[in-house]
Amino acid sequence: MPTESASCSTARQTKQKRKSHSLSIRRTNSSEQERTGLPRDMLEGQDSKLPSSVRSTLLELFGQIEREFENLYIENLELRREIDTLNERLAAEGQAIDGAELSKGQLKTKASHSTSQLSQKLKTTYKASTSKIVSSFKTTTSRAACQLVKEYIGHRDGIWDVSVAKTQPVVLGTASADHTALLWSIETGKCLVKYAGHVGSVNSIKFHPSEQLALTASGDQTAHIWRYAVQLPTPQPVADTSQISGEDEVECSDKDEPDLDGDVSSDCPTIRVPLTSLKSHQGVVIAADWLVGGKQAVTASWDRTANLYDVETSELVHSLTGHDQELTHCCTHPTQRLVVTSSRDTTFRLWDFRDPSIHSVNVFQGHTDTVTSAVFTVGDNVVSGSDDRTVKVWDLKNMRSPIATIRTDSAINRINVCVGQKIIALPHDNRQVRLFDMSGVRLARLPRSSRQGHRRMVCCSAWSEDHPVCNLFTCGFDRQAIGWNINIPALLQEK
């Protein structure tokens, strides 16, 4: 997750490395070294005691092996592009190709033509590892129920959080490592307001339940409350992003992220001073949220505490201690005075403020790695996501074990639940977004290829189930937020 301003570039470089397709082949000669007792540098050095003919043969064999690796790698990339193209053509029919199986089959065929016994063994090993490069395209008919509608591009760095306003006019909010928060028109994708009051990464954004107020948390160790006033522009026809010309496909496939030569946020009004600044933490404030009613706010920090503030006076009401490591997220119940905090200590805690005289805490243990988020649903359930690649559904009345567990192939970031339909949106480190129901049944995976979808890790998801244009939003470290239209009735019918 984000650090303070000095470490934002470091986080970005770290995430960029995840997408590197460079292939580094380390030539080892352990068997030769064991037989001859000579180190590798002597085999390659000028003073090697090996005959020149033997050295030349060795170097030639190494060159052949390297070329075979390179050919396999190129073929794998070509197969991946073919799979993307075929899936887009078949998306309208609700079909998908199992890319993992296709890639393995193709690679097996191509590997069988090897004439060298040694290179054949190495190629088989390489094939097993590189088959993971191709995305897994599991057969599902739900692709037709999920459509990319709008891309919101304007941030200069990764976007950590996305949120939808609860009051009219309904706008989209994004929080970024570029030290700003932006408000967007959902229909047009135009930036309406820029908040530039923080001096560190903006790690979360949440809207007040009844007023035009936003709450942002930052790496500068503060949380800000600021007022906005927006006027929505006239909606323009939404472009169909599912149909892209072949010329555009080649152009887009070479891009790792959106082209941001022009700063679209430079033309929108900028707010630089908050109404209220909440200052009590001694570390990065990673998340913040409004308690029911909007008169109090809670913050979560890397100093291992969560703080409860009075919004009107900015006074600290409670400091919530108990986590053993940095906090990663906090969330409030929509109708009750309950707070849930997540931590790197593999637990999340439920704090109960319904009794003004005393607050109680319950600890949930069940994950084996950082709990990246835990959120409330309607009723007595909490859903938690973790870097251990699982999502767990819990009953607040029974903390001992989850009532459902979802196992995935990638770490999970800030999840969100569609309250009305009880659908969980899972944003992954591996650029995928998957939808599950509360019992753990997978409903869909959002379309993603070299031409659409996220190009780096997806950090957060947010539902807006009543919006006519987009009812799901995601954001990621590719510096863009995306609005999706999820046909929920069709999704549930296919279930």
Curated annotation (Swiss-Prot):
Biased amino acid composition, Basic and acidic residues: 32-47
Record field: compositional bias (Polar residues): 1-13, 22-31
CDD domains assigned to the protein according to its UniProt record, in alphabetical order: WD40 (cd00200)
Matches recorded under InterPro entries: G-protein_beta_WD-40_rep (IPR020472), WD40/YVTN_repeat-like_dom_sf (IPR015943), WD40_repeat_CS (IPR019775), WD40_repeat_dom_sf (IPR036322), WD40_rpt (IPR001680)
Alphabetic keyword roster: Cytoplasm, Nucleus, Repeat, WD repeat
Domain of life: Eukaryota
Ranges for region Disordered: 1-50, 237-266
Chain intervals with Acidic residues compositional bias: 246-264
Record's keyword annotation contains NAD: no
Matching PANTHER family: WD REPEAT-CONTAINING PROTEIN 37, WD40 REPEAT PROTEIN 12, 37
UniProt-recorded name of the protein: WD repeat-containing protein 37
Upper lineage: Eukaryota, Metazoa, Chordata, Craniata, Vertebrata
Gene that produces this protein: WDR37
